[in-house]
Amino acid sequence: MATITECRGALDRLSDGLARADGDVRGAAALDRSLSCHVTDLDTTFTGRLADGRIRVDSTVQGPPPAKAQIRLAMTGDDLVAMVDGRLNFAKAWASGRVRLEAGFRDLLRLRSLL
């Protein structure tokens, strides 16, 4: 089982990858939205923002997200690490229910290029 530190590191690597991206991925990452990532097996939530092509983690809290972020992710720690490392396809994991993504319809359309 991935640790909180490993999950935070995965989010940092994802942020770095978004910052280096170009084209459609860069455009999708250019949103300015509140973000939460609930790591279900650790019952820990990272909250922050997707802004300027990066993910900024502002806090780590026990339990589910304390507020409803505009973009909400939920998955196990192992799935988060595997997805960021390229060992888990996000679209397949999302379709099978292993990963949950909730956002407004327009945001989902823009985020699809990240999938």
Question: For each predicted feature, which ranges?
Answer:
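Feature captures hydrophobic
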Residues: 1-115
